[in-house]
Amino acid sequence: MTNTRKTHPLIKIINHSFIDLPAPSNISAWWNFGSLLGLCLAIQILTGLFLAMHYTSDTMTAFSSVTHICRDVNYGWLIRYMHANGASMFFICLFLHVGRGLYYGSYTYFETWNIGVILLXAVMATAFMGYVLPWGQMSFWGATVITNLLSAIPYIGTTLVEWIWGGFSVDKATLTRFFAFHFILPFIITALVMVHLLFLHETGSNNPSGLVSDSDKIPFHPYYTIKDILGILLLIMALMTLILFSPDLLGDPDNYTPANPLSTPPHIKPEWYFLFAYAILRSIPNKLGGVLALVFSILILMLFPLLHLSKQRSMMFRPLSQCMFWILVADLFTLTWIGGQPVEYPFIVIGQLASILYFTIILLILPTVSLIENKLLKW
């Protein structure tokens, strides 16, 4: 008798991806974040769908509709806070997932890595547009400031910004189109995730040692399914603790004030997960320069496969590179902190130094240290 799981055209694909998939026997908890990101995406799409049933994308009613969701819809407050804090969890998992890739040299899988960077950019775009939808003060001014950055593009900048706005300022047209894009993007992300997995399964997973693990593979189910379930339980516990005890911990109080084009908040800042990039943007006094630095701070990830000069794939046996990696992590924490501070001394200088250090470590120090370690191997 043939097994349906292995012969059915559709179930066969699922089987090869999540059941009979040969996986390295030594992958650590750092490999859990892929499945956690899948869970986050599912949570966001589901909660987002239910929110969209009650939300209205009109400047006059958007803020009121969010209030209505929280006050009058059954468990609307829960759905809204799951969606808002689910985004934070999404980014925590994303940053850890990317960090894992950098540490263990997973970026040598070119296609998987590049699709991953595109995914990161798509999730960031989705989160930005979602933040605009409640139409609070920070939503409005965040949208104004960030979309205005495109005006730094020579020649077409101003036209481009007005085209995105659908008018001469952030208004009804902007809100409506942002809602449309915010709705469609998660489905595009889901499609990209499938491509990401397709490319990953062409090569198989990397592992902490960075060595080829073809000689020692185990089936994904039950070993890694049970491990993923543990990760999922921990993630849900963390998320629900955040939602039920301090749902506004990561939000901005300014967003509880309805959008007012006539009054600018004292400190315009994005959600915490964009602060590192925002700090890099602000650390350059020139508008176009700042925008380029902002874009490059994310796209620089695509250069990692080219900057990999070490003879070893993983950093597991490279103490000098490990040291530089953790300095880079500390630098990103510093940038995140600076992004939330006002533009004044000493924060400006700290931000500029942290931005310079960020690019220097990635473009110069890590490759140099890799070469030094190659030399040390010969001793």
Curated annotation (Swiss-Prot):
Primary site of residence: mitochondrion
Keyword Transmembrane helix: yes
CDD domains in UniProt: cytochrome_b_C, Cytochrome_b_N
Cofactor: heme b
Residues the entry annotates as binding a ubiquinone: H201
Binding site for heme b b566: H97, H196
Subcellular location(s) of the protein: Mitochondrion inner membrane
GO MF terms held by the record: metal ion binding; ubiquinol-cytochrome-c reductase activity
Membrane-crossing segments per the record: 33-53, 77-98, 113-133, 178-198, 226-246, 288-308, 320-340, 347-367
Cofactor comment: Binds 2 heme b groups non-covalently.
Membrane-topology annotation of the record: Multi-pass membrane protein
Keyword tags: Electron transport, Heme, Iron, Membrane, Metal-binding, Mitochondrion, Mitochondrion inner membrane, Respiratory chain, Transmembrane, Transmembrane helix, Transport, Ubiquinone
GO biological process: mitochondrial electron transport, ubiquinol to cytochrome c
UniProt GO cellular component terms: mitochondrial inner membrane; respiratory chain complex III
Residues that bind heme b b562: H83, H182
Family listed: Belongs to the cytochrome b family.
The protein's assembly and partners: The cytochrome bc1 complex contains 11 subunits: 3 respiratory subunits (MT-CYB, CYC1 and UQCRFS1), 2 core proteins (UQCRC1 and UQCRC2) and 6 low-molecular weight proteins (UQCRH/QCR6, UQCRB/QCR7, UQCRQ/QCR8, UQCR10/QCR9, UQCR11/QCR10 and a cleavage product of UQCRFS1). This cytochrome bc1 complex then forms a dimer.
Misc note: Heme 1 (or BL or b562) is low-potential and absorbs at about 562 nm, and heme 2 (or BH or b566) is high-potential and absorbs at about 566 nm.
Known function: Component of the ubiquinol-cytochrome c reductase complex (complex III or cytochrome b-c1 complex) that is part of the mitochondrial respiratory chain. The b-c1 complex mediates electron transfer from ubiquinol to cytochrome c. Contributes to the generation of a proton gradient across the mitochondrial membrane that is then used for ATP synthesis.
UniProt name for this protein: Cytochrome b
